[in-house]
Amino acid sequence: MATTKPYRVLLYYMYTTIENPEEFAAEHLAFCNSLELKGRILVAKEGINGTCSGTVEQTEKYMEAMNNDPRFDGIVFKIDEADGHAFKKMHVRPRPELVTLRLEDDINPHEITGKYLEPKDFYEAMKQEDTVIIDARNDYEFDLGHFKGAIKPDIESFRELPDWIRENKEVLEGKKILTYCTGGIRCEKFSGWLVREGYEDVSQLHGGIVTYGKDPEVQGELWDGQCYVFDERIAVPVNQKEHVIVGKDHFTGEPCERYVNCSNPECNKKILCSEENEAKYLRACSHECRVSPRNRYVIQHELTEEQVAAALEKIEAGK
């Protein structure tokens, strides 16, 4: 018999009207703290976007309170079991937008958005000809895992996506467009923007990758790698039938699914690397970052100037 883990991680969003995001954020933070939840929740006039962790009892109380608030009627929680908290602290922050597109004329998903496809329909659509699959996430998310045949827009943040589409419109013209993201919130706006731009056949994965991976029928099939998540777990599995590693070590190109942040705080780039290469390259993505006086790996491990010089010499020699 399957054992239930003592903690849960909740992932959810809802486009709805919140009149005073600042006031709501302060009250919601106090409520979350009273339940001893930990997580990161963004609040805007257009709605709420959150992920938080707690015990089964704590998360049940939270979901009950949210469901009893008329503003969040119909909200859907994606639930993962966990052995402990997925966050260190609890943050609830007001924001101008739930997802940052910074369009002059913003998209309201209640007014315009792409067609919703449930996992089975999305699975079937991916196999059709004349279909283009666009990953609406950032480059480092794609590098860890993605749907087979998906296009990787060369972007570092979501707000760069519209410009990338305009520069590569020949890839999409006359095609059926499928979009997907982690939980669905980015695609609500992105697919709506595509429709407004004049693309006629635009669909989005309802509930995102997380829902697709839990679907009992598709079982995450056609997904390679893992799904990047914005908590201490970093990655979660999607494909229940086979696990194909697509991530590549930043330094050697070998298969890798272990993310670290570059040790130079002014860079902080997410890089895939093994524990061995983390030590060898001082957890820095480049020579410039390795020699940074603020290199966190050097400080954390209390390395002397001689030890750093020896490490740099070894890298230079290709050893």
UniProtKB/Swiss-Prot annotation:
What family does the entry list? Answer: Belongs to the TrhO family.
Q: Which domain of life is it from?
A: Bacteria
Return the Pfam families for the record.
Answer: Rhodanese (PF00581), Rhodanese_C (PF12368), UPF0176_N (PF17773)
UniProt-recorded name of the protein: tRNA uridine(34) hydroxylase
Documented EC number(s):
1.14.-.-
Q: Which SMART domains match?
A: RHOD (SM00450)
Task: Kindly indicate whether the keyword Oxidoreductase belongs to this entry.
Answer: yes
Q: What does this protein do?
A: Catalyzes oxygen-dependent 5-hydroxyuridine (ho5U) modification at position 34 in tRNAs.
For molecular function, the Gene Ontology terms on record are: oxidoreductase activity, acting on paired donors, with incorporation or reduction of molecular oxygen
| NCBIfam families to which the protein is assigned, alphabetical | PRK00142.1-3 (NF001135)
UniProt xrefs under InterPro entries: Rhodanese-like_dom, Rhodanese-like_dom_sf, Rhodanese_C, TrhO, TRHO_N
Active site per UniProt = 181 (cysteine persulfide intermediate)
- Catalytic reaction equation(s): uridine(34) in tRNA + AH2 + O2 = 5-hydroxyuridine(34) in tRNA + A + H2O
Rhodanese domain spans which residues? 127-221
Annotated GO biological process: tRNA modification
Task: Tell me the keywords, alphabetical order.
Answer: Oxidoreductase, tRNA processing
